[in-house]
Amino acid sequence: MKRRNFCGDLTKAALLASVVNSGPTLAGSIDGKSDGADREQRESLDLLLNVLTPSKPPATGRINAFDETWEQWQKRTGELPPKFSQLPSQPLLPNVLSGVRTAADWSRRKAEIRAQLEHWFVGRMPPSPTNLRVVVTAEKREGDILVRDVRLEFGPEHRGTLHLQILIPPINGPLPVFLTNHNRTRPWAATAVARGYLGVIYFAADPIYGFEDDSDKFIELYPEYDFSCLARWGWAASRAVDYLYTLPEVDRRYIAISGHSRNAKQAVIAAAFDERITAVVPSSGNTGEANCWRYTTDPFVTESIEQITTVFPHWFHPRLRFFAGREDKLPFDQNSVLALIAPRSLLLTCSYTEDQGSDFGFEQSFRALQPVYEFLGAPRNIGLRLRAGPHPTTAGDIESYLDFLDIAFDRAPNRTLVPTFVFGYTFDDWKAQSGESPASKQASDKIRWALGSEPAQVPFPSKAPKHILVSAGWMELLYGRPLKSTVMKSIPVPFGVDLKADLYLPVKVEGKLPLVIWLHPFSYSTGYSRYAKAPFEELTRRGYAVLAFDLIGFGTRVEHAKDFYLRYPKWSLLGKMVADTRAAITAAASSDMVDRSRIYLVGYSLGGKVALWTAALDPRPAGIACVASFTPLRTSKGTEGIYAYSHLHGLLPRLGFYAENPATLPVDYDDVLRSIGKRKMLLVTPMYDRYADDSALQRMLKNFPDINVERPKDFNRFSPRTQNLIFDWLDGQRA
């Protein structure tokens, strides 16, 4: 195994001359001594400062009264990351019901979760003010609707203010309430009014929408509290509820809150901390709402902790950024936040084709919450609605949100809401569909056993017409495919069974080109296209052709995995991905522009897995380059391990029979690597990849001295620096 480490000279943070850590024991406190624990925390901080993109001052809004960026906050406070070695690794979502047997247990658990959230996630919020004063500033009629503008005054010397607008329909009350937080969603409130709700808008929202954020002044009003921007918006919602509780028109049993995108995040925070809110419809809040931090990491190509705290450092408490790349160490996740809403009504909803959305992530949250709602005797109070389309909503979406609220508020007794799954996989469902049980003896061909029984298929090229017309469907228009560029061109390539790939080429092609087959990670909502333009341009600039397509269950094929095991119960999703990749090799090799002796498989995360398993069966790839792609399945500790294949992503369900006893697993990655043989291979294994047991991985790789192993001092990220390792390695194969 040829190794290279990238420790480098890390940024030295000369920030810590005088440090006071206000957090609990997990965060640690620094007293200037250089003991081992302090060194660990300092090294963790140096790593963050060295590898993460520096945060940016918010375009609107503030972190607090002093800091514009996360780095400024860290320097001023001197806070350090927690002692990660003392925190348990929880690669799967936290089980919020662990140890909960009674209602009293659940009350204690909720208090524990809220304490965790106030420290790590949103900051400490002030208690409810007891001196609310109401000033009606205007009343008018819009048609038959009474519109009342109100200013709430509260807090020290009544210096806190919050403006509301109340839309009251001409209906005898008391009425259910539809609460939202900025005038851009006024049509949502208007739709609710048409459906018999009292509409309420409170003006605590991002000023980017053109309206003042009343909650920004809470920073100076409550200087002893460090609640973040989204928490300030959510706290403002509770002040609106304070007022609503004084109105005879309001039915206190039925107060719903909703919001879209960043406003969905604050709606969840509001409801998690205020149990007077009895229903929540957070629309496409995604990361920081229902898409859990453990499933928004770089391999999922959505919005990671690094990304969201870089662009929006004020949304959450700055301590959250400490967990970038170490999401498994978070003592909570968004399912914990959402569990605080139970047993009240909650609809999880997003588009499964929007950049930051994820059918997989939302479904995992939904499934994690179902036992909570069942424990609390309200299994019907949680819903899942995944829609197609871009991030913005339509009028029909809002009507469907109100349909859910009508059901929740007993206004539609004859209606029920059926969860809409897109991925829809569970290991238990697969067992029932396949009828399989643990193998009584080890299979002779371990790799084919794991991949399952591939059905007989017509090989490519078949005796079809010369010009085969294929389409990836309407979603490729949403993704802007093929990717547009002035430095490369593209042509469609049919392959396999009615599938379409895009072949990217230099604008001027001279001779036969080496081919890179680009295999994407777990990018459920966008497939191969998000963030692919820059590396494709670099590869074509260096003289490569690049073939890219969506794996089954991702991007334009996101809907194709749901019924896969009903159709092919003895096969596997990874087996299908391998078959499609082999078909893509065949199709590309038939092109006059491709040098079939120089075909390389390149993959990150899931794509690396597909590359390795494909090469294990197919001798045609000349080389394989993989980034953060696997960990030994028999011996790894503290990772998703077998569960990632069998229970989470449904890639190799048969492995699930060995999840509780991994040492007996019939096949592991040493078998895969041996099957690939002596072909050229690059493995990039970041030192801080939370998905890998680094010590177990390096022990395995010692048995393969011909593999080129690069070990950047980084988390599991597909950064430009990591991509350049691949590009340079590819160039080295041409020398």
Question: What role is predicted for each listed range?
Answer:
Residues M1, V20-V51, G650-P653:
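C-terminal segment of N-terminal export signals and the immediately downstream linker at the start
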Residues N5-A27:
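N-terminal export signals
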Residues G32-T161, A342-M488, V493-D498, D671, ...:
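Alpha/beta-hydrolase-fold serine-hydrolase catalytic core, especially in secreted/extracellular enzymes
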Residues H158-T161, I168-V177, D498, V507-L515:
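Proline/glycine-enriched tight loop/beta-turn segments at coil->beta junctions
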Residues L162-L164, A189-A192, G210-D214, I269-A270, ...:
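Short, solvent-exposed loop/turn and secondary-structure capping segments
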Residues L179-T246, N286-Y295, W518-A584:
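Cap/lid segment of the alpha/beta-hydrolase catalytic domain
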Residues D242-D298, T586-E640:
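Primarily recognizes the serine-hydrolase "nucleophile elbow" in alpha/beta-hydrolase
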Residues P282-V337, S358-F366, V372-A378, V627-V672, ...:
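Mobile cap/lid helix-loop segments that gate and shape the active-site cleft of serine hydrolases
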